[in-house]
A protein has these predicted regions:
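Ubiquitin-like/PB1-type beta-grasp interaction modules and other compact soluble beta-rich domains
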Residues: 1-88
Length: 89
């Protein structure tokens, strides 16, 4: 399945576009999607640890703008948003 991953906040550094297209297996979970994103980052950004930390600490939201957890099952091609943590110093 093809996921259009909408990028927000710090995750916008992952692409020149405002999204990534990620392939996942049928009935993948958000946990599986998170793993595929990390593989993408390892391949395209040489394992940038800051980017990987962003992925590990981000929340995801469905097409209906609902927060979804790592067990959420992806059953079709769809848009999913990634919402990195917001922090300051």
């Amino acid at each position: 399945m093809r996921i259009k991953l909408e990028l927000f906040g710090a995750s916008r550094d992952f692409s020149k576009k405002n999204h990534l297209e990620i392939e996942v297996q049928d009935k993948a979970s958000i946990k599986d999607l998170r793993h595929e994103i990390i593989l993408y980052l390892n391949e395209n950004f040489k394992g940038n640890e800051n980017f990987i930390k962003i992925i590990k600490s981000s929340t995801f939201c469905s097409e209906n703008n609902e927060i979804i957890n790592d067990n959420y099952e992806i059953t079709k091609d769809q848009k999913i948003g990634i919402i990195p943590p917001i922090g300051g110093g």
